[in-house]
Design a protein with these regions (language model features):
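Glycine/proline-enriched, intrinsically flexible loops and inter-domain linkers
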Residues: 1-174
Length: 174
């Protein structure tokens, strides 16, 4: 589906993404490969590989229709997972685990700039700092666009981020 999505974005972006619009495409991968895993292969994070496929397809299609293909961006989600214990040593010790969703920018598009701090192809934006800080003992000292990280050119890539996170308690984050 991710591969077909990449094809549809370039070949027919005006057509809705559904079973009917994807039916003309056929994609095959060798059995046993990372794209066609065979039981009992571990596939827990297969969505990460899947989210990288549209950029791979774009790289192939750029050879045939370079004026329709966006530049490669930061790719899919870049998540940072923290875990630890609160109030270590007290009777009220709790274990926490949080995944902070962070993103780079998308590549420049053929007729406009890329999107800043947005995962592609999902379009997922980052988790607000306030939500992360309310559910885990962490402090975001800084979360801002990285100036000029979109590169130069007629159309620039979306901006990435600079993020600084620290433990809010006297305990290490894992």
């Amino acid at each position: 589906a991710y591969t077909c999505f990449g094809l549809a974005c370039i070949v027919s972006p005006e057509i809705p993404n559904n079973a009917g619009s994807l039916a003309p495409f056929s994609v095959r991968a060798p059995e046993g490969s990372i794209l066609n895993a065979v039981y009992p292969a571990a596939v827990c994070t297969r969505h990460i590989i899947g989210q990288m496929l549209p950029d791979t397809v774009f790289g192939c299609l750029a050879q045939a229709v370079p004026d329709r293909v966006p530049a490669e961006g930061a790719g899919c989600l870049w998540n940072v997972t923290f875990r630890g214990e609160t109030d270590r040593g007290s009777n009220d010790t709790k274990i926490f685990c949080i995944t902070a969703v962070t993103n780079g920018g998308t590549g420049a598009r053929p007729s406009k700039d890329g999107l800043s701090a947005t995962a592609y192809p999902s379009g997922v934006r980052g988790t607000p700092v306030e939500i992360n800080e309310s559910v885990a003992p962490i402090i975001f000292w800084r979360k801002e666009y990285s100036p000029d990280s979109g590169g130069v050119g007629k159309h620039r890539g979306g901006l990435g981020q600079v993020i600084e996170i620290e433990s809010a308690i006297e305990a290490d984050l894992e």
